Structure formats: C-alpha cells, structure tokens
Amino acid sequence: MKIADKDEFEKQNVFGTGTPNTAYAKYFIGESYLNPLTKPEDGLHLLNVTFEPGCRNNWHIHHAKSGGGQLLICTAGEGWYQEEGKEPVSLTPGKVIVIPAEVKHWHGAKQDSWFSHIATEMPGEECSNEWCEPVTDEEYNKLG
C-alpha cells in the first residue's frame, strides 16, 4: 500500500523510522533513516531502513570472495529494487529480495510513498561494499 503521509506511515512502520542516515547520506538521493534492530556484534546485523518518497540509494555492489550478498525484507510502504540490466521489481510489505554477491543494484521508495525494509548482509568471506553512481532522475522517473 502506497503511503504518502508520514504520520500514517509511522503507524504502519512497525520497526520504527529511526534516525537520519547521516553516515551514508552521500550514497542516497533524498532522506533516509536507520533503525538498528540488532548490533553488529550480535552476529547478524539487522537494520530497518526507511526512505522518504522518491529517495533511493546509489547503484552498489556487495562483493565477496564466497557467499555474501544482501537480504531485504519489505516492511511498510512501497518501493523499488532493480538489478543492472533487468526490469525493476515493485516492493510491498512481505516481499523478500535475495541479492547475490557481485550483482550491481539499487533500492528505494516509489515517488509517491514512504518505504521501509529490513536489510542485512549475508555471511561470506572477504565481504565489502562498492558504492557506484547515483540512479539518475531520468532512470528513476521512468519507473512510474
């Protein structure tokens, strides 16, 4: 369900919006927020990531010698996920996306909806992230 109103979104966003994502703001167009659900030292770091309408992260790649990748679990609002060279996937609550290592991709909110997902990096060897170019307005506006 698309949710343009922030107050209404807060009622649906069961894991909470969290605080402004200042640490990674340079890799996002628009405002995003982070609410850590676990700590990195817990063994599995889960974050609830919230995107304001129109917000998306840059293209990026989760590298790993073996294993690795990322898992997204959509929790509120509506968003997009897209792998390079493939059609975008509409994200709604309950949708799970498994992103293998070495796949260039991006994710974020639809133009007219707040959006949240839980994100975690999959276990692997020699894991790292590479942030790439922004998703252009031209690319994004084609999504509808």
Pin down the residues of each PLM region.
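A short, N-terminal "cap"/entry segment at the start of jelly-roll beta-barrel domains
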Residues: 1-45, 128-144
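Short, conserved beta-strand element in jelly-roll/cupin
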Residues: 48-52, 63-81, 120-123
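Short acidic-glycine-tyrosine-enriched beta hairpin
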Residues: 85-102
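A short hydrophobic beta-strand segment most commonly corresponding to one strand
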Residues: 98, 112-131
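Asparagine-centered strand-capping/turn motif at beta-strand->loop junctions
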Residues: 108-110
